[in-house]
Amino acid sequence: MKLSPFGILFLFLLILNVASISSLNPNLNPIYAQETNSQQLIGVNMLGYYTSLPQTRDFKNPFPDNYYDQSFKIIKDGGMNHVRYVYYWESYVKNPTAFINELKFAATIADKYGLKIIYDNHQFHTSSWLNPQRGTGFPNFLFQNNSEYAYGSGGGPKYPSAVAWWTHWWNREITDVNGTDGWTLQSQFLKKVVSTVDSHPSTVGYEILSEPQVHSVDQWDKVGKYNTFLADELRKVTKKDIVYSMSIPVDLKSNIGVNATNLAKMTPANKTNTIFKFSIYGLPSPGSYQEERLNMFIAAGNLSGVPVYIGEWNNVDRDKVINEEGDFVYEINPEESDITPEDTTAILKKFNEIDPYGWAFWYWNFRPHRVENFNLVTSDPSGNLIPTKYFDILKNAVQSVNSGKGSK
């Protein structure tokens, strides 16, 4: 086809106009989108209200007004771009409507501030059924009417009830009263979370389950099958990142084989947009036990061929104590635990050497924690959020260590 001079000029202007529009619209410009999505996530863990309510207890602390707007603004102004949003399955069962509405609201406010959220399906001591005082996680209907894991019998890794329950969980033997297995039930719940927030630009991914318990050598492969099942189910409803977590307990001298090779067995078979999350609660100084653990996690990520994500980090002091079962365990000493500006800077510099997918400090919560350096924010009687000295320490370290650092 032969074009006239006018036709050539028109075609040139049309191409120029389309290019200009694409450069201004991230959705039309794949290069811009790639740069945006490759930005390292740096931020904090965060708890909400209805999304973290245990079934066996309620919160005594009032929920601050404009909690999300205040929080996200402070986090954004502090030079961070990320929130690992901690929620619990049993919180959904307790109040499904309030749970979903809070998720929607949090995602909308995160959009406003340009933050990036990973939604973390969390558990601590398995469930409030096993630990009514402190536990939260799996819903009560997965424990009822079974003498192996009676109410209040202990959900931490050292308790026989927790060992029994997690063993049945990995064998896919936990069911509801209708006989539907727990893996399927959990996938149905996670899909509800995805359908609620997946369309939001602030949503970058979903964590299958935070820090599941492993109690025997044969369970590593079973965790891999579980992660594969959940990841495959989530892939049916989202193209965003899927995060799988390290297990607990993390004792390098234990008889269950806590090493990079076994950790890599937990990786989902489909590694598309898959991330390995681990936690660090100490200074990984040269030659230290924490450095040995950190190196193991990095090696596990390398063996799996997936990026690593430091989904929780802080600095704590642990004491060796005897629990109710007569076993030695290490528990956090609230009085001795602390993190200094020097500690924070050293940890962030170490992270920069690793160049991870991202990291999230533990943590941002409207309820005060007995470990002082776990408190990034407090609230006054009027509901105004007030960052603590630990947020200032984190903010200043981020600014000094990451100044001038752009996209990866």
Residue ranges of model-derived segments:
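Sec-dependent N-terminal signal peptides of Gram-positive bacterial secreted proteins and lipoproteins
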Residues: 4-24
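Acidic, histidine-bearing metal-coordination/catalytic regions of metal-dependent phosphoesterases
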Residues: 16, 33-36
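Signal peptide processing junction and immediate N-terminal pro/mature segment
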Residues: 20-33, 190, 243
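Active-site mouth of glycoside hydrolases
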Residues: 37-259
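Extracellular glycoside hydrolase catalytic/binding regions
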Residues: 60, 64-65, 175-357, 375-383, ...
